[in-house]
């Protein structure tokens, strides 16, 4: 396949144009007065959302060079979402501003490598200052963080209650309700950090996850590599017409191929994951899962083998959600007495062990067994509203978790403005010289942009607001919802510092790559290439 090439300034300008198109699409959603974006779907109703990463994932541009820029900006949003779960629009706006200001300097003759170094040093100084300015979350601030992310006080209160009940490390899942009410239900469940063995198991392509309702659960201590050994069990599961969830040390070779083929053909809705943990801890964790789901672990030690067992060794659960990294089991069929006995056994082990590492791992297992799962059932009048609400609640859960981890700073873009003081005080920044020193100004101008757009979307002059906030004390800032300048933390306008730092670092990373790019190579469109070599 022939390629198209772009060089030097033309290459960088194409990347900038692509980043601009994506950033201009998402930045209208920034802040409490941000607008929505409507996404067309090939089938079903359109999606209405103000979630940056959801919008970014839908953007594909005609121009292949510009599309590279859009994909880079998409990477900023996706990475920020992976690390912090929110802040995707802020990250995209920062990336756009850093690229724009940086390219201006490069076009004027500055050395891209020096500009890159200056941006990296400046951003690290600002990120460190953000952490210094952060404070731990207290009381009602949990509800405030969630309410700001979800743009709903009602959802904020619901999430504060959920985290209050399951703890900051507890699992919160989001399901669709059959009513119009949104409610919190506490249920027994568990999450562990193993995802599906193959993306072919995915049932929801948009969210890249596999969801099994009312599923049978097979827990096998060893590897499954031969189809013959578990074919009888597979046939029995097929006759039951229920989905099958398999946990094993590994599923490989023809066994995995058979499961994938059955899944693709729609013969059997099946998902396989590797067992969590290692060695003796893996055996213990499998027993925990078995207790929770009413299953028996298939193991030679217990005199059980796959080719000789029936449906009686399988457990069940109301709902199992599997992503590429995690598995969440909700409402397992294990009896309350069995779970209580297992919890008592773990507590007894905890009192007997002297090893800090063992204690930590036992406490993790105890939390998973005893802590339960908070299920938020999202209700809405229409399917379009339901999807949009689910996006907002997912962002809010991630934001709240991030706030509980690293603390909070003043929201509304003000924290970035206050952290700019680090550029005048940090010795690593003040020691920069030449083109690297000019990059400090690039970061200084870029960090104003999130606040500028929050104010602009609310109908105010962004630059005037930013100038006024720069003169105020730390934690003072502009409340776009009320239009007042006030103590934002006291007013409940707060952001998780983890989200702000992740947005800043990811934006700087992509901007540095764009500024040091010299050549772009893309596929030549098929219609242009069709008659290549046949011209007479």
From Swiss-Prot:
The keyword Isomerase is assigned to this record: yes
Catalytic activity entry: ATP + H2O + a folded polypeptide = ADP + phosphate + an unfolded polypeptide
Main location (coarse class): cytoplasm
Keywords: ATP-binding, Chaperone, Cytoplasm, Isomerase, Nucleotide-binding
Cysteines joined through disulfide linkages: none
Entry EC no(s): 5.6.1.7
Example GO molecular function: ATP binding
Binding site for ATP: 29-32, 86-90, 412, 495
Matching Gene3D superfamilies: GroEL (3.50.7.10), GroEL-like equatorial domain (1.10.560.10), TCP-1-like chaperonin intermediate domain (3.30.260.10)
Stored InterPro entries: Cpn60/GroEL (IPR001844), Cpn60/GroEL/TCP-1 (IPR002423), GroEL-like_apical_dom_sf (IPR027409), GROEL-like_equatorial_sf (IPR027413), TCP-1-like_intermed_sf (IPR027410)
GO cellular component, one term: cytoplasm
Location(s), subcellular: Cytoplasm
Pfam family, one: Cpn60_TCP1
Swiss-Prot/TrEMBL GO biological process terms: protein refolding
Free-text function comment from the UniProt entry: Together with its co-chaperonin GroES, plays an essential role in assisting protein folding. The GroEL-GroES system forms a nano-cage that allows encapsulation of the non-native substrate proteins and provides a physical environment optimized to promote and accelerate protein folding.
Family, per entry: Belongs to the chaperonin (HSP60) family.
Subunit-level organization: Forms a cylinder of 14 subunits composed of two heptameric rings stacked back-to-back. Interacts with the co-chaperonin GroES.
Identification of the protein by name: Chaperonin GroEL 2
Source species of the chain: Arthrobacter sp. (strain FB24)
Gene: groEL2
């Amino acid at each position: 396949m022939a390629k198209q090439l772009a060089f030097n300034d033309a290459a960088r300008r194409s990347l900038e144009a692509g980043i601009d198109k994506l950033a201009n699409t998402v930045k209208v959603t920034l802040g409490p007065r941000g607008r929505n974006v409507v996404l067309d779907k090939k089938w079903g109703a359109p999606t209405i959302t103000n979630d940056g990463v959801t919008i970014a994932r839908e953007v594909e541009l005609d121009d292949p060079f510009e599309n590279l820029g859009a994909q880079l900006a998409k990477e900023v949003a996706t990475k920020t979402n992976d690390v912090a779960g929110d802040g995707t629009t802020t990250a995209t706006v920062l990336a756009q501003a850093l690229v724009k200001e940086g390219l201006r300097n490069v076009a004027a003759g500055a050395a891209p490598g020096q500009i890159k170094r200056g941006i990296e040093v400046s951003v690290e100084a600002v990120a460190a200052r953000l952490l210094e300015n952060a404070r731990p979350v207290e009381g009602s601030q949990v509800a405030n963080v969630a309410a700001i992310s979800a743009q709903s006080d009602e959802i904020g209160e619901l999430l504060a209650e959920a985290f209050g009940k399951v703890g900051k490390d507890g699992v919160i899942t989001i399901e669709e309700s059959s009513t119009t009410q949104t409610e919190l239900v506490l249920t027994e469940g568990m999450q562990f950090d193993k995802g599906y063995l193959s993306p072919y198991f995915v049932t929801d392509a948009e969210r890249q996850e596999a969801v099994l309702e009312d599923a049978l659960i097979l827990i096998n201590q060893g590897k499954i590599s031969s189809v013959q050994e578990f074919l009888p069990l597979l046939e029995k599961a097929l006759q039951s017409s229920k989905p099958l969830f398999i946990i094993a040390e590994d599923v490989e070779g023809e066994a995995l191929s058979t499961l994938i083929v059955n899944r693709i053909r729609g013969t059997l809705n099946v998902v396989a994951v590797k067992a969590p943990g290692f060695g003796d801890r893996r055996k213990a964790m499998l027993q925990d899962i078995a207790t929770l789901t009413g299953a028996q672990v298939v193991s030679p030690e217990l005199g059980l083998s796959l080719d000789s067992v029936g449906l009686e060794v399988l457990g069940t659960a109301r709902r199992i959600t599997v992503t590429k990294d995690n598995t969440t089991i909700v409402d397992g069929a294990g009896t309350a007495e069995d779970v209580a006995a297992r919890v008592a056994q773990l507590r007894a082990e905890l009192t007997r062990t002297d090893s800090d590492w063992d204690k930590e791992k036992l406490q993790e297992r105890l939390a998973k067994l005893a802590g339960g799962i908070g299920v938020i059932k999202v209700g809405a009048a229409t399917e379009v509203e339901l999807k949009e609400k689910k996006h907002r609640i997912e962002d809010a859960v991630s934001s709240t978790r991030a706030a509980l981890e690293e603390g909070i700073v003043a929201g509304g873009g003000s924290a970035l403005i206050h952290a700019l003081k680090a550029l005048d005080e940090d010795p690593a920044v003040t020691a920069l010289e030449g083109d690297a020193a000019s990059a400090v100004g690039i970061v200084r101008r870029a960090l104003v942009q999130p606040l500028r757009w929050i104010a602009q979307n609310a109908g105010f002059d962004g630059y005037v607001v930013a100038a006024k906030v720069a003169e105020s004390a730390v934690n003072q800032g502009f409340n776009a919802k009320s239009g007042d300048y006030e103590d934002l933390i006291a007013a409940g306008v707060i952001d998780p510092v983890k989200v702000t730092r992740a947005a800043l670092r990811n934006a700087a990373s992509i901007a540095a790559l764009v500024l040091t790019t010299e050549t772009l190579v893309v596929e030549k469109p098929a219609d242009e290439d069709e008659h290549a070599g046949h011209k007479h």
